[in-house]
Amino acid sequence: MTIVLLVLGLAAGSYAYANTQHGSDQFGDGPKMAQGAPPDGQGGPGGQGPGGTPPDGKGGPGSSSADIDYSGAVEIASKETESGKTYASTKGDQSALLVATTDEVTITNPTVTKSGDSDGGDNSNFYGLNAGVLVKDGSKTTITGGTINTSANGANGIFSYGGNGGQNGADGDGTTVTIRDTKIVTTGASSGGIMTTGGGTTYAYNLDITTSGQSSAAIRTDRGGGKVVVDGGKYTSNGLGSPAIYSTADITVSNATLTSNLSEGVCIEGLNAITLNNCNLTANNTKRNGNATFLDTIMIYQSMSGDAASGTSQFTMNGGTLTSKSGHVFHVTNTNAVISLKGVTIENKDAESILLSVCADGWQGGSNVATLNASAQKLSGAIKVGSDSQLTLKLTDGSTLNGAIDGKITNAKGSTVSKEVGKVSVTLDGTSTWTLTGDSYVTEFNGNASNVISNGHTLYVNGVALKGVK
């Protein structure tokens, strides 16, 4: 079965580590797949968005048109139930298993192996070419148990492509992958564990995923977005520009262990969202990728590559643990972001102990604006807001902050980013407190001054020392 898709006018760049690369590696070294290199480890298409490549990387502009010939070593084109079968491909740009049907397909205990590199970044990153398992055309496919192993560049483990042609915000064709109790291992670049694009949907339960290549998030999405729901399991990424989760979609993860051993733990690009419920997230971001000039655990940005629509990015975490071994815990740049935390245990092991930075980085064209909502939450560490940036901080329901707010910011390259603080609004409800660890500077303060514990320091509101603090 040969399916030809004409793709028109792809435009994009990538973040510091895009999922794939479009001719240039946004993160720096590494294979030059077709996407651009975003922070999460993805490359950008051959060009770079206004600021260059996006962090986690999503595709960039790509070619003006592309003909995609889909093929699979095994192809399913109608309703099917299979159990205990082996699906293997060693041919470039061929999937081990291609499911292209509007019907329901059920697969139990498969053994999937895929080698043979993809020739093109956009085709493998946006449309599913060369995946271990590719599901498309509106199929409802359920996979239970078994293993999926890929050892090629541009070879995502399982790919749900929703058929919207990479149009962000457009509805997909109903393609839905439900996968549970499966072990997935990928070793090549631009090879995520579970991949969702084009308005596809993925439900994943109790998976064991390990990725090792650049731009290879364990839970990965790209242009056209979609919906991803994960419950249970372990998700580990080891490569450059490869966060545990890279979001250009709506992603909810519950009761899971998420680990990134080189890159950010989570990357959100543009008008997209990640919600973590009772998860344990650990990141050790020790190497910058692409345009990124900071090291961080939660990276929220807009690459302007075209992989994600511009708008408010949202990161929500309820319960669980967040362990940041290197760099800033949260970093917001070139976008508007809302961070909501409730009852999360945060452990910041970095010597500088910076909780949040909102400032310029390696991308341009957007603003640096963040809102941090903390409910029943303990926060500790410095908050840095650049002179061209804005922060709204709200503490409620017995939340506490031990830290200082200022605008003195130096990036991981040692370059000065800001010397003066931007616009900062802080609100404390009657049950929440702020203990200063240094002189702090805000534009607006709402709440009782007595809920601020000076600890020998001064809180300045529009340049005037706040009176009535403890």
Language model segments and positions:
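Sec-dependent N-terminal signal peptides of Gram-positive bacterial secreted proteins and lipoproteins
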Residues: 1-17
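Disordered, low-complexity segments in secreted/periplasmic proteins that are enriched in proline
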Residues: 18-67, 164-171, 288, 304-306
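Surface-exposed loop/turn motifs in large extracellular/passenger domains
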Residues: 62, 67-84, 99-117, 125-150, ...
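Beta-strand-rich domains and repeat architectures in extracellular enzymes and scaffolds
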Residues: 88-99
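Terminal, low-complexity, charged helical segments
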Residues: 406-407
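Surface-exposed loop/turn positions within long extracellular repeat scaffolds
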Residues: 420-423, 436-446, 460-461
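Extracellular, surface-exposed repeat architectures
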Residues: 456-470
